[in-house]
Amino acid sequence: MTPHKWFEWSSGTSELSLRGGNMETHTGQFFRKWLEAEGLFPVNYHPAEGEVRIYANSKQRTIATAQFFAAGLLPTANIPVEFHGEFDKMNPEFTPATTFLSPEYEEAVKNQIDEIYGERLRGLKDRYDLIKDIIDFEESEAYKSGTVTEFSLDDMEITYAVGEEPKMTGTLKAACSVSDALILQYYEEPDAQKAAFGKTLTQEQWKQVSEVKDLYNDVMFAVPLVSCNVAHPQLQLIRSELSQEGRKFSFLCGHDSNIASILTALQCEDYVLPATVENTTPIGGKIVLSRWTNEAGRQLVSVDLVYASAQQLRDLTLLDLKTHPVVVPLTLKGLEKNADGLYKYEDVLQRFDEAISEYDKIVEEYAEQEMDQAA
C-alpha cells in the first residue's frame, strides 16, 4: 500500500523487537526500585516459592517480554517465566476468544458497536486521508494495479466463532495494519520525519494516525457485551492472583486486546493518556493493581495504567524513581475512592466478581432467547 520501504525491523513479524526488550528491562528495573522503596522487596530479593509469579502467554513476544521484564525486576534471582502449551501458540487463558455465541447475541453485539463507536467509525475519513498522504498511497503498486483503490467507511465486517478471536475484514482492518506499522516505525526510527516517509507531522497528527489502530482494538474488544465474554479467563486469573495468600508480586503478560477487554469489563471510565501518541492501549502498557494495608488494618487497592512515554520509548530512557514511566490512575465506575485515590479491597474484588458473573448472565439471557426463537 506504499511505494516506500519500511524501517528494517530488528525482529520477525509479531515478535518483540530489540528496543522492546530494552524497554521492558528498564520497566522491570523501575518496578524493582519502586518495590524496594516501598519496603515490599529487599535489595537483591530472592523470592521464596510462591511469592512471585511471572506468567506469560505462549507467544514469542509475550515470553520475551516477561523474560526481559523479569531480568530488570529480579536480576539475581533467576526467576522462571511460566508459560503453558505449545511455543508461539496462544494460551486459552490469554486468548480473547468468543466462548459463547448465538445469533441473537451476535446481533446485539453489532448493535452495541454501532451505538458506542458508530459515529467515530463514520468519522474516520480525515484519519484515512492523513495515512494515505503519509504513505503516498496513490503511488503504491496496490493502488496502481487496482487491488486497493480507496479507503471506504462502510465496508467493515466482523465475524464471531466459538473458540476464536473476533475477525474483521474491510478498510479499518487494512488501515489498522498501516497505522500500527507507522506508530512502531515512529518509536524505532530516531528521525521522526523519516518515520513519516519524509513528511513532518505534529504530535496531534501522530495521535490521529494511532487513532485508527486504537479504534480497531476498541471495536473488537472494548464493547461491553464482547469484553465479559473474551476477557472471562483473564478476569478469573487476575482475581485469583489479587487474593492469592503469600503472593507479593504477579506479572501476567498478555496483549493490548487483553487490556482493552479487561478495563471495559471492569467498567473503567474513559481516561486520557498524556505524553504518548496512543489513545487507549499504549505500547508496553500495564494495568497495575497494588494492594495496601493502612494503619487501621484495612486493605485498599490502587488501579493504574503504567507505560513509558513516547519520548522515553524513542530515547530508550533509563527508568527509575526520578525518571519514572507515566502513571495514569484509573476510575472504576460506581466505586468510591478515598482521599489517597484508593479503593476498598472488597469493592475491587466484588467488581471482579460482577464482571466474571456477567458472562453467565450473557449466556443465560441469549441462550434463552435462542430457545424462544426455536420454539
Region spans (language model):
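Signature for phosphate-centric chemistry
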Residues: 1-53, 57-250, 254-375
